Amino acid sequence: MRKIRKKTDKLVDELIALRNSRKSIDDFFSSHQINFYENCRLMHSFVLNDDNKKDLLTIAYRQYYVFLVSCWETFFRDVFIYVHTEDENLTNRLLGKMKPAADTFDESDIALSELLSKSFNFQNIKDLEEAYDDLWGGSFLQSICSKDAGPCGVNGQVADEFVVKNLFDDWHEIVNKTFSIRHKVVHDANYRPDVDIQFIQKAEAIFLLIPQVATHFIAEKFNLKRIAFSKDGQYFPYIFTVSEILSDDWVVVE
């Protein structure tokens, strides 16, 4: 049985800091794209600039894994907190599978949903699946990567079908390998991964697409706002590709 962490001063301070940087439930969908946009453009500026030395590209390549996983972790942690703030029944089901600490239900400056988020490592597929199990009825990532998100807007057009697994049948392996590389980069300054452009292109696409597809289905479930695409008087949920994230011809409007 998974244990709920004790409310130490350090943990409370950390959760309050995370709360202060977290946007509202109506904004966090676009927050992921904006976070991705800033770092994706930086990485690609190294790739496109012929004046950059190879060692600078290698450094940027290593750090890109840290960024990809950071965006992923932030998104799924924030969604977890939002969902468990909105749905008390969902929280009660999760609590039934966990072992509370002595101070779990004591009054404090942090919400129960925030405390529960610290019981899971969102950089680990098994942990993420367990955190979202009650929301989706099990196999959360496998389900959203196999489920059709169409019709939706992609690359300025309406796609009748959009299934992550059909685009990347090895998404699970790519995610796990990216987690592994990120862990080595963060904890071993001597580690130098081989620069594999084909792999990193797959990884950045998957780490951009899966949170957006998750957004699509979670927004449907909780009737939340999402980014939409207008075509012939109809509105469709929109999914950004890497090429669109890198372009300068789009803005988010209300």
Predicted regions, residues:
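Polyanionic, low-complexity intrinsically disordered segments
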Residues: 6-43, 157-162, 166-254
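Short amphipathic alpha-helical segments and their helix-coil junctions
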Residues: 38-56
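Helix-loop junctions and short alpha-helical segments
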Residues: 50-60, 64-176
